[in-house]
Amino acid sequence: KTYINFSNKNSIPLLFSRSSFPYKKIGILVSDDFSDNSPVNIAFDLASTLSADVTALNISQPKFLQPEHTSTSNKNTERIQDLALSNEVQCEIVNAEGNEAKVFSSFTDKIDLSIVSQTSQSNWQGKKIAEFILQNAKSSVLYIPN
């Protein structure tokens, strides 16, 4: 929590290393943030530089909570696939359902580096998701400040 506050206040990315180098599989959450310093763009830049693959985890709420989510989600996954092609990086999209923080954290044993930031959801919820992943990830985590 303190590290996230420091990172955000000083605009410094932080790497939480968990001895998972070399980074051959980079994991990200599918989101609608495609800005220059977004986890999505940074993941593809790093993957291109390190000759790594990207795995994008597309986590949706259970259908009874949010039935009309698929069109936005499909647009985001299409944009991620376009980024993969333009960066000449292998990208796998994995679809899952449930709590974003818990599902992504449980997925980190299959990747070497997770790239996260506060999500575009409400500020406190996005921060809690990032904190949970930082504490529970089995891979190294690169936190990108907003």
What are the functions of these language-model segments?
Residues 1, 63-71, 124:
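Short, flexible/disordered intra-domain loops and linkers
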Residues 9, 21, 25-69, 81-90, ...:
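Small/aliphatic-rich secondary-structure junction motif
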Residues 1-22, 108-146:
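Gly/Ser-rich helix-loop-strand patches that form or flank binding pockets
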Residues 35-36, 73, 130:
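Short, conserved glycine- and acidic-residue-centered signature motifs
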Residues 39-40, 100, 125-129:
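Amphipathic coiled-coil/heptad-repeat helices and related helical stalk/stem segments
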Residues 76-81, 96-108:
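A short, acidic, amphipathic alpha-helical segment used as a generic capping/interface helix at domain edges
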